[in-house]
Amino acid sequence: MLKIFTKLFGSKHEKDVKKIKPIVDQINELYGPLQSLSDEAFRNKGTELRKKVRDSLIPIEKNIADTEKKLDNPDLSHEENEQLNDTLDNLRKEYETATASILDEVLPETFALVKETCRRLKGHTYEVMGREMVWDMVPYDVQLIGGVVLHQGKIAEMATGEGKTLVSTLPVFLNALTGRGVHVVTVNEYLAQRDMEWMRPVYEYHGLSTGVILSGLYSHQRRNEYLCDITWGTNSEFGFDYLRDNMAGTVEEMVQRDYYFAIVDEVDSVLIDEARTPLIISGPVPNSDTDTKYREIKPWIEQIVRAQQNLVASLLGEAEKTLKTKPNDFDAGLALLRVKRGQPKNNRLSKMLSQTGVGKLIQSVENEYLKDNASRMHEVDEMLYYAVDEKANTIDLTDKGREFLSKLSHQDQDLFLLPDVGSEVAAIDADANLQPSDKVRKKDEVYRLYAERSDSLHTISQLLKAYTLFAKDDEYVVQDGQVNIVDEFTGRVLAGRRYSDGLHQAIEAKENVKIEGETQTMATITIQNFFRLYKKLAGMTGTAETEASEFFEIYKLDVVVIPTNKPIARNDMDDLVYKTRREKYNAITSKVQELVAKGQPVLVGTASVEVSETLSRMLRAKRIQHNVLNAKQHAREADIVAMAGQKGAVTIATNMAGRGTDIKLGEGIREMGGLFILGSERHESRRIDRQLRGRAGRQGDPGESIFYVSLEDQLMRLFGSERVISVMDRLGHEEGDVIEHSMITKSIERAQKKVEEQNFAIRKRLLEYDDVMNQQREVVYSRRRKALKMDRLTADIMDLLLDYCNTVVKKFHEANDPAGLEEQVMRELMVEFKPDPSAFEREPYEKSAEELFKAASEFYHRKESDLPDDIMRQIEKYAVLSVIDQKWREHLREIDGLREGINLRAYGQKDPLLEYKQEAYKLFVDLLQEIEHETLSLAFKLFPITPEESEAIEARQRQQAINQERLVAQHKEAESAYEVSPNASVDSTMSMPGDEIVVQQPIRAEQKPGRNDPCPCGSGKKYKNCCGTNE
């Protein structure tokens, strides 16, 4: 029915393109006359356009600036402040509307200008990444359509080789005319620098400046790059700079400006594949015993894993023996189900699953035990030492496993069970024989015991995961004594990224490399919430249509499929399905041999480093020359890709998503059928498979693509094999036979859709959790920025003082304790206030509160008059910033702890998300109260220091600046929707972070100390008598 309607009325994408066609016609009309202009007259056109845009926006910008200046007035009443803020909000909305209006007006003329600029650059030679490149590009009509779509804040899906990089110049140029800065986001730094150097001539022709953010740049260099009209960089660099700006100690340390317009290249990779990995700036946890903890427990885990492997081997042997005589035996099926629960990646089990009827038998046994809400699944698991749920990525110790570990560790089995805190605390409260002090002590013991056991069980769980669910050269590689995660979507090593929640340390212990210390979160934001900061967001990719609903639901981004310049001539064949991996690999090598003999180039796509190296060994055995491109050979990437389209070339590459380089065909290859794409297995995401197919058939070139699949592949094993196995069983397939049918291909795509839906649910859930933090982050960062710019600080402190006076007086008035009030006010504000005891009891508390406010404000104003104005403002700024930074870090730690355990609330029939929102709100209310209280106290108590104290503090600050090198920015790899940040305690020494947090090259904290200065090592001696003795 849907197909009939589409035929009658056209698809959504056809309608989208049809609406833009008149704009394209208008661009081409304006393009013609520009060709006859002289260079000078043509350049003047660009200047005129820029002036036209700026002139239309300057009046509103002036109104905004004037309103902001009025808000700086410390004498404003609360009502006046509110009115001005409302006016400012309306002016900003008006500014965005005016910007959109003027840009739409000049769009046809600007796009025509860019097109003519490209024509004039034809034949010119430029250096791009050290290579000479001749400019030969002028936008086609379909590229103009793509440019309009991007300007409208949508996602343009364009096939590989259709010139996405050139398309981006059109909306980037147009939006850069505003002078507000445009950000172009790429998947890696190589592409950021390459695209900047490649497209720079178009922008520089008309005086627009270009910059690129690279990981090794210092703050002042970054600031200069952000001040350019157009700035390229990776999503993580832009995100980390946002976090660092919100940790800055001065306005001068901040590097970014307005978040106006961002175009995200490979938008699906950035906004979907990386959406589960939050950006985290973390610092070391002092006195962490991570290394000892993992090393101590590791031998126990190795023994329990070996015991489970022996048990699994025994169960498999029994099942194999029974199935020879009784093919449908229930007990044999139960044994195999236990093997599946105990060691799901077992090779012998994978081979047995390819036998007729075995998969069906295991499924029927599992269905039997899953009845009545899986009430009998414990009977399956009780024989095992631990049960593995591969789909959920979880491992549970059984009673048998706990008993095994208690014998190994010579400790009570109860040590591997968490105490029921609630019931134990209730029992203590109900015990009438205990004194109040004894109750407090016993409760503390219960909480301590829970924390210790929880920590040990967590370490055991993470080590078990490391040994059973994470394989070397698949999920990670070990290079130079470090465990590096491999991106499952691109096959690249993710430098600097770590698994969260202790899993990375567990893998380091397993691989016998140095175990890095635990970290604490200093600042964090998810990719989703960072990109929501932009007023306008757009993206381009070759594959977005399959995720269109997610793009719209999460980011409110519409997807428009742009037609190709020439029809796609690639032949996409149905999948070939084999029973075992061995059969599949043999078939792949035979096919490669056949293609080499013919001279047709072939690209073999693999899902892991391990598979790429296995196929490489098999091809070497057949003496077939080939190149391998995976996480271990990434340095040769550009050269390998450049040769992949030549005659007889064989290239094995882990997932080609995000490679960013087109494979151009050599001479005579078109006649052979073009590039042959051979996928060695289906990926979890249809999008990644489409990207691999898209490497062939660029710009109307011929090409072929096919996937070879086996029932032992991860996707088939977890989600898709039952239906396919039953089909193969009915057809009576023997070893070595292959099945090829569109029904099988559709079945595999259904399995992929199932996984995509599951992953979307996880990303959506993560966002729902982070939305709670996002609202809190916005409030805290907004207060911090206000303090950094020293906006109305004195007036705010007076507001805090008024609230404080009312709260504290009311508290002591109710208790009739004037002496207590006097003592607390002196301790917290250093203000002498002695209320008359008889009047205090007789009169309403508001009168005493008024008297206290008068006394405290007089004290504060005396302090102001005694100190220079700039010193007083610095004291206020320091009071606000230092308290916010310390309390925010403590709050992040508490939120980490809350998020870690909130899932357990589901066992009590409670919605974990709702519980999380309620608990997080309570924590946030407490945070704001603490910030206000301690800020007020610090502002009153801080005074300038003597020269001698100054010397000692400077020495400490120099040491602290050196300690800053230990802070790292990490794009954290999340295990699941709820495990996205490390569990760490607070390092109170880091109260005022500076700007050089991620250190890619050596940093000098400041100038070398003088000979009579205190030594920066913190010894207290003079530099000449300590570290400077040899100079």
Curated annotation (Swiss-Prot):
Q: What is this protein called?
A: Protein translocase subunit SecA
The UniProt entry's GO CC annotations, sorted and at most eight, read: cell envelope Sec protein transport complex; cytosol; plasma membrane
Catalytic activity, EC: 7.4.2.8
Instruction: For the region Disordered, give the residue spans.
Output: 1001-1021
PROSITE patterns named in the record: SECA, SECA_MOTOR_DEAD
The protein's organism comes out as: Chlorobaculum parvum (strain DSM 263 / NCIMB 8327) (Chlorobium vibrioforme subsp. thiosulfatophilum)
Q: Does the keyword Transport apply?
A: yes
How does the cofactor bind to this protein, according to its record? May bind 1 zinc ion per subunit.
SMART domains, alphabetized: SecA_DEAD, SecA_PP_bind
Q: How does it assemble?
A: Monomer and homodimer. Part of the essential Sec protein translocation apparatus which comprises SecA, SecYEG and auxiliary proteins SecDF. Other proteins may also be involved.
